[in-house]
Structure formats: C-alpha cells, structure tokens
Amino acid sequence: MARLAAFDMDGTLLMPDHHLGRETIATLARLRERDITLTFATGRHVLEMRHILGTLSLDAYLITGNGTRIHSLEGDVLHRQDLDPQVADTVMHHAWDTRASMHVFNDNGWFTGQEIPALLQAHVYSGFRYQVINIKSIPAHQVTKICFCGDHDDLIRLRIQLNEAMEERAHLCFSAVDCLEVLPLGCNKGSALAVLSNHLGLSLADCMAFGDAMNDREMLGSVGRGLIMGNAMPQLIAALPHLAVIGHCGNQAVSHFLTHWLDNPHLPYSPE
C-alpha cells in the first residue's frame, strides 16, 4: 500500500476546463482517511496552489514551480531552489530567435512583458494571473524559473538555442506541448519528491504518482508506482514504456483508478 500520493495538476488531476471534479475531490478525501499523505506536484505557483488547496479542506504538501519549492502542511518552506542568477540574466536579456512569449516566476508571482488573455483561461479556477512588467527589470537572483509559451515547433528550435547558451547550467523541459521551461539544474518534480519523501521518513518506493507531461518524467520514473494519463504527451509514454497508462483527465481517470485501487487492491485495473 502506497503511503504518499503525488499528483500533477494540469492534464492529470484537473479536467480540461481546469476544474477539479466532484469524484476527484471525494477520492482525495478517501486517501486521507486511509492515512495516505497527499502532495500536489505542479508547475503552478505556490500562491495559486494555496488558494486551490484552501477550497478543498484537505491537508497536502505542495511541490510547486516544477520542484523549485516544497511547502509543508503548515505552509513553511521545506526546500527551495532558484535559477543560477547568470542563467536567469542570460535568458531574460538575450534576444532569442522565437515568437514565444517569456514568463518569469519568483516568490512574488508570475511576470510577463505583455497582456496575453488566452493564458489566463488555465487559471479560471483560482483567479491567479500574471503581472505585466519590463522583464529585464526583474532581479536575476530572485528568479525561480522562466517559461516560454508558443508553437511547439518554434519552442523546439528555441530549446536548441537555449541548450547552446546554457551549457548544461539549467534543466529544460516541456511542461506542455506549448510551454518550455527553464529550471535550476537538477531541479524537477522527481528530485523534489525525493526530498519530501526523505523528510517524511519514506522512500520513493512508498510513493505513487500521476502525470501527463515531460515535466512529470522524473517523478513517474522514480516512484514505486507511476501512472501515465491517457491524454499524456506521446513523448512521455515513449520515455516510460514500462508504466501503465490510465484514462483521460476529462473522465477523472485518477479518481477512477484510485477508487478501484482502494476497493479492489488485488484485482487488475482496466481504464474502461
């Protein structure tokens, strides 16, 4: 029996309309009744996740910013990792050959250089939003991560540019088809979950995790039981071919799987 359950949010726990379904909320409560510790492992900001958590009346640890921060049940920082200031400075100030928009994150929020209302749709549940600012004015020593949002093919070309400029001083990953993230070197959900597991006196073998994108790869590949969403990026399924694929987030597949796991732990699972 797993003792710690880690959940990605977008494309996993959240439905396509970016809300949590009733069945999902009820199933999370059942896990807590079984004394299974919960953690939400997401690229979203802790300020947003605290608001979401407050609406659920659930105790959960928070792994946010794709592993750049870990917060306790009481809201205390258990772990923090920022981008190398030189890396942040280079990314923010260089004239990259891309049409993608740049987004900078630190403990104070989400910052971008122009209004992009379409990006707010993913945050309708919480009301969290960006602040429009001159990105070059942000102190480089306070940056947790930087994201680029745009066309996937354009982002693939941008990743080549970033890799050449970073010289392995940062971790690059796709948190969605249209979002490329620049993270601190060695920082990902898997490494953060290892820190949290150790803090709780557990091993990664005691954990189960759910995800759908390449920023979930390390987490899913390192736990005792990793589950991939049916709507996952094809690259993730190809990277972890030994892991089970469950149903679609639109059908609350995490809840469907966990209900079966709680009620019939010894029977094989089918997403149908």
UniProtKB/Swiss-Prot annotation:
Keyword entries, A-Z: Hydrolase, Magnesium, Metal-binding
MF-aspect GO terms: 4-amino-5-hydroxymethyl-2-methylpyrimidine diphosphatase activity; magnesium ion binding; phosphatase activity
Xref: InterPro entries: Cof, HAD-like_sf, HAD-SF_hydro_IIB, HAD_sf, HMP-PP_phosphatase
Known catalytic reactions: 4-amino-2-methyl-5-(diphosphooxymethyl)pyrimidine + H2O = 4-amino-2-methyl-5-(phosphooxymethyl)pyrimidine + phosphate + H(+)
Binding locations of Mg(2+): D8, D10, D212
Enzyme Commission number(s) of this protein: 3.6.1.-
Active site: D8 (nucleophile)
Cofactor list: Mg(2+)
A Pfam family the protein falls into: Hydrolase_3
PANTHER family, A to Z: HMP-PP PHOSPHATASE, PTHR47267
Family as reported in the entry's similarity comment: Belongs to the HAD-like hydrolase superfamily. Cof family.
Chain's role: Catalyzes the hydrolysis of 4-amino-2-methyl-5-hydroxymethylpyrimidine pyrophosphate (HMP-PP) to 4-amino-2-methyl-5-hydroxymethylpyrimidine phosphate (HMP-P).
Protein name (Swiss-Prot/TrEMBL): HMP-PP phosphatase
Organism: Salmonella schwarzengrund (strain CVM19633)
UniProt gene name: cof
